[in-house]
Amino acid sequence: FDYPMAEGVKKTFRRLYTTNLAKAVSFTLGIEDYTEVLEEFKLIAGDIAKEYGLYPSLQNNDEYKAKEWEIASAKYGDEFSHLQDRAEKLAESETDRATYQAMEALIHNLNTMNSRAGAQNPFSSINYGTDTSPEGRMVIKNVMLAEEHGLGNGETPIFPIHIFKVKEGVNYNPGDP
């Protein structure tokens, strides 16, 4: 469950980072319509991805930001790296919130869905716990938080059944990531 969901989290972070960076640059330089700046940063991101195989990410984003700075600092000035940092922090926060909302929706939908007979909820379970990427860990954290929060009005969700996988070298021993 966590591996495929992490791919969606990566895409969300990339989109939010680029959008937030375009907004930050627009606000700083007094550009009223940020869509042109956004399109420019989308092109820059595409060029960096093609040439270097780098993307904005929750982990080790420094190399991507350095390449982006090389391209954009001439046009946007030395304060550009500060704007990158702000956009990164905001994108991480917004990605975390979007991930929580997605997990909340999953739990809500699984507990309000009826079977074809209309009398029961379909049995569902999810397996997670071995993805050590920041995106995978964000998925795991937020699915557990959404489960803990419940369905509202004090109602505890019955589904999905959570199966947390334990693996040596991943999450079994105290020193594992």
Regions found by a protein language model. Give the residues of each.
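Conserved catalytic cores of very large enzyme subunits
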Residues: F1-P177
